[in-house]
């Protein structure tokens, strides 16, 4: 999440400066973001290496889980630096209209991870059976593959575009203070959102094994669907950001509406498909029929809310942020998560004594608040700001 905040700011600045043909400022944005990403990921690597048990102890008191998780945590921590570099370089590539490279790298990394998980976890084709340690090694290697693929693509694209990399940490159009003002709200927002997710997970854990199993069962398909449509958020940030960099304000607003419409149609189509196939998906799992039924209902609820979630991603994660106003999104996220979502979650679970379906349905209504406020901000156009 923290690395995502750095790459988000990198994307905002690079898109605007490339749109304004301020090449030096674009490279400066890249350099500053890369250094920030390296420092932050190195600190997380150090923390994971020195205090793995203490960190995992915040989530569980089961020593067997902590000991096993520490093995995984120590290895996976080495993927933080490659992940940071990959994300920031990917931001540059997307802003330079080479989004295919990060896409192919992601597909390749998933393929490498899947194959290595099979080989190392279960000890196939002569490899030792490593269990969770094998899963960690597979993830680390897949991240290294991702970095190498993106790095090669980055070099080739620079040559193709005739770009000359510029090493500079000194902005002319903005200051380091402006950079920090943009990044700090995102860091705070992402941290509090992650904390909120942990609170929600803790609540789900207290609902009983069947309820938790049903929610866990839906995780992969939710992640796949949101991941597939999240590209619209990244595209919105780049396309609208370039317009703002060129001071094409009306065009930026019009393009934003087109992207929002595309996201709504795409999400609605995928949601309809998910509702139709929800029973088929849960049928693949060898679990109790009660768990399958709960999982199916949860998928339907998720599908109904998905268009709202996608619109929030496009607006909050792409369009409104493209003008550099990250503070307003932080406020929306904090109110949505901590003033609406978490209280409703606790109310449904501990006061109403509802099961997972009721808790999840009530919790997710906070997405409606986010959308309503984001649309008001969007229509007022105060987010339309050129940093150039």
Language-model segments: residues:
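Small-residue-rich hydrophobic transmembrane alpha-helices
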Residues: 1-46, 83-102, 214-278, 310-332
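Short runs within selected transmembrane alpha-helices of multi-pass transporters and secretion channels
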Residues: 7, 11, 76-95, 102-113, ...
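Short alpha-helical transmembrane segments in multi-pass integral membrane proteins
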Residues: 14-81, 127-184, 240-305, 348-388
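Helix-terminus/linker motif at the lipid-water interface of multi-pass membrane proteins
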Residues: 56-63, 119-130, 187, 191-224, ...
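Transmembrane helical elements of multi-pass membrane transporters/channels
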Residues: 75, 86, 109, 142-146, ...
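A gly/Pro-rich, aromatic-decorated transmembrane alpha-helix motif that marks the paired
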Residues: 115-119, 342-346
């Amino acid at each position: 999440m923290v690395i995502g905040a750095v790459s988000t700011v990198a994307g905002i600045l690079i898109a605007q400066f490339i749109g304004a043909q301020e090449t030096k400022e674009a490279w400066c944005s890249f350099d500053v973001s890369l250094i920030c990403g390296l420092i932050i990921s190195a600190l997380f690597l150090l923390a994971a290496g020195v205090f793995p048990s203490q960190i995992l102890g915040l989530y569980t008191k089961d020593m067997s889980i902590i000991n096993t998780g520490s093995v995984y945590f120590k290895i996976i921590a080495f993927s933080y630096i490659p992940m940071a570099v990959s994300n920031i370089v990917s931001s540059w590539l997307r802003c330079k209209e080479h989004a295919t490279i990060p896409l192919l790298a992601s597909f390749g990394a998933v393929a490498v991870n899947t194959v290595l998980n099979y080989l190392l976890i279960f000890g196939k084709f002569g490899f030792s059976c490593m269990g969770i340690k094998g899963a960690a090694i597979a993830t680390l290697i897949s991240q290294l593959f991702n970095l190498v693929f993106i790095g090669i693509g980055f070099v080739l694209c620079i040559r193709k575009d005739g770009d000359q990399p510029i090493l500079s940490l000194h902005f002319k159009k903005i200051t380091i203070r402006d950079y920090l003002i943009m990044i700090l709200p995102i860091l705070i927002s992402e941290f509090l959102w992650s904390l909120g997710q942990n609170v929600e997970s803790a609540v789900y854990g207290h609902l009983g094994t069947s309820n938790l199993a049903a929610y866990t069962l839906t995780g992969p398909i939710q992640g796949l669907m949101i991941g597939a449509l999240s590209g619209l958020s990244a595209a919105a940030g780049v396309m609208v950001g370039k317009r703002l960099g060129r001071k094409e304000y009306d065009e930026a607003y019009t393009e934003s509406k087109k992207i929002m419409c595309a996201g709504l149609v795409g999400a609605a189509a995928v949601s309809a498909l998910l509702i139709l196939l929800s029973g088929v998906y849960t049928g693949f799992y060898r679990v109790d029929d009660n768990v399958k039924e709960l999982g199916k209902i949860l998928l339907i609820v998720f599908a109904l809310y998905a268009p709202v979630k996608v619109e929030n991603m496009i607006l909050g994660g792409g369009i409104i942020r493209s003008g550099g106003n990250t503070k307003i999104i932080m406020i929306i996220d904090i109110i949505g998560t901590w003033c609406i979502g978490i209280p409703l979650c606790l109310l449904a679970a501990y006061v109403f004594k509802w099961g997972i379906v009721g808790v999840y349905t009530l919790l997710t209504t906070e997405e409606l608040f986010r959308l309503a406020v984001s649309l008001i901000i969007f229509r007022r156009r105060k987010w339309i700001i050129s940093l150039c």
